[in-house]
């Protein structure tokens, strides 16, 4: 099947950023919010210092996004490549996470959240599609699922709700579909549908789009999978009727709507209670949180003396502040027909839920790591 990919963006922003950085780059943020991307590009070029400081990942993510919006797809991918390499260079383990959470936000480097890392590959895939490079676009969407597996390995005892990306699987299906590989397209669509109906519906309140169901039926038919076709016809309560495809192909329309959330922070104050015999407890009365900590054997005398002099500990954690979407729905009108757009990915929901999972999983380690 011949597809034409159309990507329409209204104030779409992949980087959540942090509140202090957001305030310092007000002119850039204002230019982006007004759709003045040439001005935003000039502001980035003028402030090359950001490319070398602790927020250099943010700089290259912003550059990749702005170049994408300007239609400079190769330049966009060059910036995203640098951002991707920088994220891979950062250590990914619980000790580092704890240190990041409790250190001074003005000193620590910006560390992208998991969904932001995934969005790098998403935008690289879109760039390759715009360059009509289906093969490399497919590589990027495959990397999304591999990267999700790697990211989830960081939290073996507190698995994320964001373990599979349904939209990445859907995009993979579209690319296979465009290449005429209907069997692999069906497999990708099926994976996407299963992820929507399990992970996404349960965790993010998002069910499979109707168009995905239609594509699943069509590719099952085109692949000669009669049993699968019959099963999905029964499940969807709709009969598939083969129809000739338009000679000039079909339009795939993506609408990327809204800004990602802004990252701020919140803190919890713990009071130390010495239980004796090397056992202390960190307690927060307001939230009802209590974490026991043994500091006997294995700790030096200096460590024990330092801990003995501490009565109160404040641990700082990240949080998100949502920026509402400018539009709540969209409709395409063509040839006398209206097509209502359906949401396929809710970045806000993913951001809030996964951050909650991460903080819940490492809060105890962060309290202990403070010492």
Range-by-range predicted roles:
Residues 52-56, 87-97, 149-157, 193-230:
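Boundary/linker segments of alpha-helical solenoid repeat arrays
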Residues 26, 62, 66-69, 116-119, ...:
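"A position-specific structural signal for the A-helix of alpha-solenoid helical repeats
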Residues 43-45, 80, 87, 141, ...:
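Inward-facing hydrophobic residues that define packing positions of alpha-helical scaffold repeats
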Residues 15-37, 48:
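Bacterial Sec signal peptide processing site at the extreme N-terminus
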């Amino acid at each position: 099947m011949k597809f034409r990919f159309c990507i329409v963006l209204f104030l779409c922003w992949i980087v959540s950023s942090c509140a202090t950085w957001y305030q310092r780059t007000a002119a850039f943020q204002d230019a982006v919010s007004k759709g003045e991307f040439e001005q935003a590009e000039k502001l980035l070029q003028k402030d090359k210092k950001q490319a070398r400081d602790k927020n250099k990942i943010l700089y290259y993510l912003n550059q990749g996004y702005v170049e994408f919006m300007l239609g400079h797809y190769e330049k966009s991918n060059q910036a995203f490549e640098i951002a991707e390499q920088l994220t891979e260079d950062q250590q990914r383990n619980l000790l580092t996470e704890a240190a990041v959470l409790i250190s001074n936000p003005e000193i620590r480097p910006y560390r992208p959240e998991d969904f932001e890392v995934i969005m790098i590959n998403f935008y690289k895939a879109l760039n390759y599609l715009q360059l009509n490079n289906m093969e490399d676009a497919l590589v990027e969407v495959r990397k999304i699922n591999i990267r999700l597996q790697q990211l989830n390995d960081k939290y073996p005892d507190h698995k994320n709700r964001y373990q599979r990306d349904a939209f990445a699987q859907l995009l993979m299906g579209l690319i296979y579909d465009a290449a005429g590989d209907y069997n692999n397209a069906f497999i990708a669509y099926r994976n996407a549908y299963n992820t929507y109906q399990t992970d996404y519906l349960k965790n993010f309140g998002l069910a499979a789009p109707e168009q995905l169901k239609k594509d699943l039926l069509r590719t099952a038919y085109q692949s000669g999978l009669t049993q699968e076709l019959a099963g999905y016809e029964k499940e969807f309560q709709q009969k598939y009727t083969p129809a000739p495809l338009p000679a000039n192909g079909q339009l795939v329309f993506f609408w990327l709507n809204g800004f990602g959330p802004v990252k701020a922070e919140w803190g919890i104050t713990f009071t130390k209670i010495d239980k004796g015999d090397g056992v202390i407890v960190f307690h927060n009365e307001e939230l009802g949180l209590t974490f026991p900590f043994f500091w006997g054997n294995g700790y030096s005398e200096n460590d024990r003396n330092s801990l003995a002099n501490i009565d109160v500990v404040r641990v700082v954690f990240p949080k998100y502040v949502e920026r509402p979407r400018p539009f709540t729905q969209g409709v395409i009108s063509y040839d006398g027909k209206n097509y209502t757009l359906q949401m396929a990915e809710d970045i806000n929901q993913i951001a809030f839920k996964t951050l909650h999972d991460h903080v819940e999983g490492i809060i105890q380690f962060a309290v202990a790591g403070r010492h």
